[in-house]
Regions:
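Single conserved hydrophobic/aromatic residue that forms the stacking wall/gate
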Residues: 1-7, 11
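Long, hydrophobic/aromatic-enriched structural stretches that serve as scaffold segments
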Residues: 4, 17-19, 268
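A short glycine-leucine-enriched loop at secondary-structure breakpoints
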Residues: 6, 136, 178-180
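Extended Lys/Arg-rich, glycine-bearing segments that form polyanion-binding/interaction patches
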Residues: 12-136, 250
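Flexible, glycine/charged-enriched surface loops at secondary-structure junctions
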Residues: 29-31, 47-55, 140-143, 193-204, ...
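Short beta-strand scaffold segments in enzyme catalytic cores
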Residues: 80, 140-141, 158-161
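Conserved catalytic-core subdomain
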Residues: 87, 91, 99, 146, ...
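Zinc-dependent deaminase catalytic domain
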Residues: 131-144, 150-153
Length: 277
């Protein structure tokens, strides 16, 4: 995304390269990728919004263009970048959401495409999302596809938990998307002195932490929302409320810090932003 005021971009090519490799699609050279995005953003400069929380959303994608039937690797592809101005994700403040722990459907399994940014992952998540909405929940907390036991992602976002002062998030083992926001927040958290555990957390341990009060905060992480606080988890006949259904202090601080870097209000000591001249 980019802001008009600073004309800076937060972009990442490595994830697309890995996604393309898994799908037997050609990779886009990093220099070409970055220059293409910069050229498009420069051309669309008048469409970059300047109000707080707004941005020009940048979406690169690739699809096959070979005119043929059958299941095989295509001979030709098209690489496209589109942009759209978007309003503030939290126009009325950052409000926690109610999450359904999904124990019927699964999002991904090892050896599949769970770590890629491909349409099939989103298609397989729709049934769970519809089920959650019917139960009065906003999103789905996905469990692993083998044991149906370990938490992985929430909706289309990575998720983090603050339990007894430490941070927990699912490891990158082929079923979880290696989110750019996830990676950014891990860097920030460790710089702040937090212990970040990239490890398997069972839903039973999550619910137990909720009941005994050690589950202090929970939040999804992603490009559009940056962070999305969780106020309640519903699992089978049980439920736990997180932080009295209020956004946590750490969640708010992470949001303010990362958006501050993106908007050029805070120093970018990590080199995450790219100026567009």
């Amino acid at each position: 995304s980019t802001s008009r005021r600073q004309r800076q971009m937060c972009i990442r090519d490595s994830r697309m390269i890995k996604s393309n490799e898994r799908l037997c699609m050609p990779g886009v050279p990093e220099e070409m990728f970055v220059e293409a995005v910069k050229a498009l953003v420069k051309a669309q400069e008048d469409w970059v919004p300047s109000e707080p929380g707004t941005s020009l959303y940048i979406r690169p994608f690739m699809f096959a263009t070979e005119a043929s039937l059958g299941v095989h690797m295509a001979k030709s592809y098209k690489f496209v970048i589109i942009t759209t101005p978007v309003g503030a994700y939290y126009a009325e403040g950052i409000n926690p959401v109610k999450i359904l722990v999904e124990d019927e459907y699964v999002r991904a399994v090892k050896g599949g495409t769970g770590f890629t940014k491909c349409g099939g992952n989103y298609a397989s998540s729709i049934a769970g999302q519809v089920k959650a909405e019917k139960m009065g929940c906003t999103q789905v907390l996905w469990l692993d596809g083998v044991h149906r036991k370990y938490v992985e992602e929430v909706g289309t976002m990575n998720i983090m938990f603050k339990i007894a002062g430490e941070i927990y998030t699912a490891p990158l083992e082929g079923t979880v998307l290696p989110g750019v926001t996830r990676d950014s927040l891990i860097h920030i958290l460790r710089d702040w002195g937090y212990k970040v555990n990239e490890t398997h957390l069972s839903v039973d341990d999550l619910m137990k932490a909720g009941h005994d009060g050690t589950l202090e905060e929970a939040f999804g992480t992603g490009t559009a929302a940056v962070v999305s606080p969780v106020g309640e988890f519903v699992y089978k006949d049980d439920s736990v409320v997180v932080n009295d259904f209020k956004i946590g202090e750490l969640t708010q601080k992470l949001y303010d810090t990362l958006t501050g870097i993106q908007w050029g209000k805070l120093e970018d000591k990590y080199g995450w932003t790219t100026p567009v001249e």
